[in-house]
Curated annotation (Swiss-Prot):
It comes from Hyphomonas neptunium (strain ATCC 15444). Part of the 30S ribosomal subunit. Keywords: Ribonucleoprotein, Ribosomal protein, RNA-binding, rRNA-binding. InterPro entries: NA-bd_OB-fold (IPR012340), Ribosomal_uS17 (IPR000266), Ribosomal_uS17_bact/chlr (IPR019984). Transmembrane segments: none annotated. CDD domains: Ribosomal_uS17. This is Small ribosomal subunit protein uS17. One of the primary rRNA binding proteins, it binds specifically to the 5'-end of 16S ribosomal RNA. Gene3D superfamilies: Nucleic acid-binding proteins. The gene is rpsQ. GO terms for biological process: translation.
Length: 81
């Protein structure tokens, strides 16, 4: 099965080799028919500490690296300040 890839914004990069990424998704509410935005935060493994707060990055699913880390940083998209 292919690994999931998501894009999100780095919320925190203070920990060593870890970036916390906020991923936003939109969907239509089944009853209200209104577009709803929902966000999740994921702990991603950042081997080279390249992530910077506010940066948009892609993360990929991987084998568990710690209690919370099940994602790894794949590529940087650009910076937003």
């Amino acid at each position: 099965m292919p690994k999931r890839i998501m894009k999100g914004v780095v919320v925190s990069a203070k920990q060593d080799k870890t970036a916390i990424v906020r991923v936003e998704r939109t969907f239509t509410h089944p009853m209200l028919k209104k577009i709803v935005r929902k966000t999740n935060k994921y702990h991603a493994h950042d081997e080279n500490n390249v992530a910077v707060e506010g940066q948009t990055i892609a993360i990929r699913e991987c084998a568990p690296k710690s209690k919370l880390k099940r994602w790894e940083v794949v590529a940087e998209e650009g910076t937003e300040a």
